[in-house]
């Protein structure tokens, strides 16, 4: 959530910066609501002062033996007007709050300006795609050959965009997640965390999924109790660990990592990636979250992105790193890097990780703060998140990049300890 003071004092500048994201800020509506709020607030404050004075005069008139009925009637009338003013003020503030909750974050000055993914800037590449001496198969053909990747049974159970993994491929999927978690806790300094997979609405509002992206979520309604939502990413539960907290400076940075299933309705993805495991309603992901002091967040973004890249390097999977442009960034981000892994069957790079610095945007929504030792006052922290990595898409990349002419799959060197020393699948 943007700073309301910024919206009041630099509204047009905010609108111009948001325009670079393709977002049109309703400046006129915000100005109108702010003007109404000021009028009602001023009138209410004046009325309260007048009522206080009139209440004081009642006691004085009573001491003088005067009729206080007219004064009492005035005080009662003013009380009613104050109540009406409060209702009016609350309604104006509620509309302002609703507007602000749907405004995306402001892009950092270093973010390239662009309308869509065509404006993204490649920062670096690592590895060289293999030149196969045979016809490349996609992960579906490779997995279905031995019955280890079963979309037909998954569809019978759950419908479209689900996968059933069996045997060595299920084991390889588990091995990838274990490898990622171990790398992040042992080498990158993250704290392993197990979180709920169901959260209430305030948690999703805190990280920015609600109210704007409710159609992308799976919701569980419960009579007489708060609705629950299946997490679309562990970013939600991990980041909200510090919701409503005031952290000591010595606690920062906090670095959390979790392996969880993620659930997304993919409401806007009709017709896209309908084959295979690239876009699923349910998928596993290893998620990294950092909570840092504001001055440290841009450096933390580089570090967090490097942590995700290290996974791909150790798996020896070719990838590229992109700086997302203003028009392609996520709602809560001030700056984002995407990692794209090489998928041989598609002859192109596909997203496998998104690493973002959200500045104080999520912290303001969550009221997550730290006590600045220089001022002694609570101030908003900065939050970062990144996939380290999406397990299903990493499995796809391993299956395709490590395939052999007979359809078997070589096991990456770093995964062999997790596969009982198995060297080849199939």
Curated annotation (Swiss-Prot):
The positions annotated for binding ATP are 264-266, 351-354
What keywords would UniProt list here? Answer: Aminoacyl-tRNA synthetase, ATP-binding, Cytoplasm, Ligase, Nucleotide-binding, Protein biosynthesis
Residues the record lists as binding L-serine: 233-235, 287, 387
List locations, semicolon-separated.
Answer: Cytoplasm
**What molecular function does GO assign, one term?**
serine-tRNA ligase activity
Q: Which Gene3D superfamilies match?
A: Bira Bifunctional Protein, Domain 2 (3.30.930.10), Serine-tRNA synthetase, tRNA binding domain (1.10.287.40)
Q: What EC number(s) would the UniProt record show?
A: 6.1.1.11
Q: Which reaction does it catalyse?
A: tRNA(Ser) + L-serine + ATP = L-seryl-tRNA(Ser) + AMP + diphosphate + H(+); tRNA(Sec) + L-serine + ATP = L-seryl-tRNA(Sec) + AMP + diphosphate + H(+)
The main location class comes to cytoplasm
Cellular component per GO, a single term: cytoplasm
GO BP term, example: selenocysteine biosynthetic process
Q: Identify the pathway.
A: Aminoacyl-tRNA biosynthesis; selenocysteinyl-tRNA(Sec) biosynthesis; L-seryl-tRNA(Sec) from L-serine and tRNA(Sec): step 1/1
Signal sequence residues: none
Tell me the function of this protein: Catalyzes the attachment of serine to tRNA(Ser). Is also able to aminoacylate tRNA(Sec) with serine, to form the misacylated tRNA L-seryl-tRNA(Sec), which will be further converted into selenocysteinyl-tRNA(Sec).
**Self-association and partners:** Homodimer. The tRNA molecule binds across the dimer.
Comment, domains: Consists of two distinct domains, a catalytic core and a N-terminal extension that is involved in tRNA binding.
Membership in a protein family: Belongs to the class-II aminoacyl-tRNA synthetase family. Type-1 seryl-tRNA synthetase subfamily.
Q: What is this protein called?
A: Serine--tRNA ligase
Which gene is annotated as encoding this protein in its UniProt record?
A: serS
